[in-house]
Every structure is written in structure tokens, then in C-alpha cells.
Amino acid sequence: MIVEFFRYGAGLSKGPLDYFLGKKRDREHAKILSGNEQEVAGLIDSSPFAKKYTSGCLSFYESDLSDEAKRKIMADFEHCLFPGMSSDQYRVLWIEHRDKINEETGERRLELNFLIPNTEILTGNRLQPFYHEADM
């Protein structure tokens, strides 16, 4: 698994949502696995913070992970990003992509993309998910 955090995060939700889902929400081989698109967009668009969201991707060599395995990976990743927090304190929109081809196998590569509003839900305070470039 490769983890990549994207450098963007200052704009409105339209940018990352258009990328993840397509401008008309019709990106081929893209589907929402978890989270609420409208809620995440509302949190990002109403954010008073300079960096309104964090986004990135988990990319896999394997193309045949079960839905249960994907759910576990997403939950474990959230647990690492939000240590000590409960799931009612943050929101994550998870979008699966399968539009890139693995050149070695010829199969579609699995990517689990995430979009996180940088707002703590219960307090409205700024929330910056942990990742090494910002926190170490």
C-alpha cells in the first residue's frame, strides 16, 4: 500500500469532488464507499480556516480486496489519523477509483481516496489530521 497526501486544501469542495467523482459526478470507475458527499462539501465550503480540507489516496498493488478488507483498511487508517477521537468528531468521504491500469498485471489498480474537512465536528475548531510531513 502506498499512502499519498495531496498538497491541496485551501479551496472550496468543488475542486476535490470534481477530481474524485467527475464534474458531473460521472467519473468512470469511481464510487463513494463511505461518508456523505453533501455533508463533507458543506463543512469544507463553510470552513473559516485557510486549509479547509485534507485529501489523499491509499494505492494498492492488489486489485481484488474484499469490501470487508477495504472497510477495515479505511477504519484503521482513520484510527491512525485521528488518535483518541471518536468518529462523531470528524468526517471522511472515501471514494474508490479503479481507472488506472497496473502495467505488470493489466488489471485495474485499486485506489481508496479520502477527503477530510479540517473541522472538528463537535466544537467547530480546526482539525488537522496527523501525517508525518506536518507532525514530525
Regions found by a protein language model. Give the residues of each.
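N-terminal nicking endonuclease/strand-transfer module with a His-rich metal-binding environment
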Residues: M1-M136
